[in-house]
Swiss-Prot record:
Gene Ontology BP, a term: protein K69-linked ufmylation
Family per record: Belongs to the ubiquitin-conjugating enzyme family. UFC1 subfamily.
Protein name: Ubiquitin-fold modifier-conjugating enzyme 1
Source organism of the structure: Drosophila mojavensis (Fruit fly)
GO cellular component: cytoplasm
């Protein structure tokens, strides 16, 4: 189910140990530390391989995440806002990643711009609780979604390049 490139990417993202969500206040801080360490490592790996494609930050509690992601297509950079909340049942329940500006532009999206991850990602997440975290959701959820959907939306003329200069 996972190709060699994805397997290599995954092997370079640290697996998490602590099984805690936002409801477990004391342990959540420790889980959040693991999340940040995994995200930092994933971003460093992406930069080293020339495939840097997102920036994330969170509120103080680590329950709301937001930032930017981008996809390069025909040497043009398409940039999108990305956001998600950490579910109260996390890490059992994966975060629902949203790209609000693409809401309603593709069938592979739910209301509010939440990307569809049901068929491929969620079963993989369920098998890897609590080892998977936010970095894994980005690598296995958002990255492949962008790779499939953005070129299709561009070719259909649904999204167009915006020059940010």
């Amino acid at each position: 189910m996972v190709d060699d490139s994805t397997r290599k990417t995954l092997s370079n993202i640290p697996l998490l140990q602590i099984r805690a969500g936002p409801r477990e206040k004391d342990v959540w801080v420790q889980r959040l530390k693991e999340e940040y360490q995994a995200l930092i490592k994933y971003v460093e790996n992406n930069k080293q391989s020339g495939s840097d494609w997102f920036r994330l930050e969170s509120n103080k509690e680590g329950t709301k995440w937001f930032g930017k992601c981008w996809y390069m297509h025909n040497l043009l950079k398409y940039e999108f806002d990305v956001e998600f909340d950490i579910p109260v049942t996390y890490p059992t329940t994966a975060p629902e990643i949203a790209l609000p500006e693409l809401d309603g532009k593709t069938a592979k999206m739910y209301r509010g711009g939440k990307i569809c991850l049901t068929d491929h990602f969620k079963p993989l997440w369920a098998r890897n609780v609590p080892k998977f975290g936010i970095a894994h959701a980005m690598a296995l959820g958002l990255a492949p979604w962008l790779a499939v959907e953005v070129p299709d939306l561009i070719e259909k003329g649904i999204i167009t390049y915006k020059d940010n200069c």
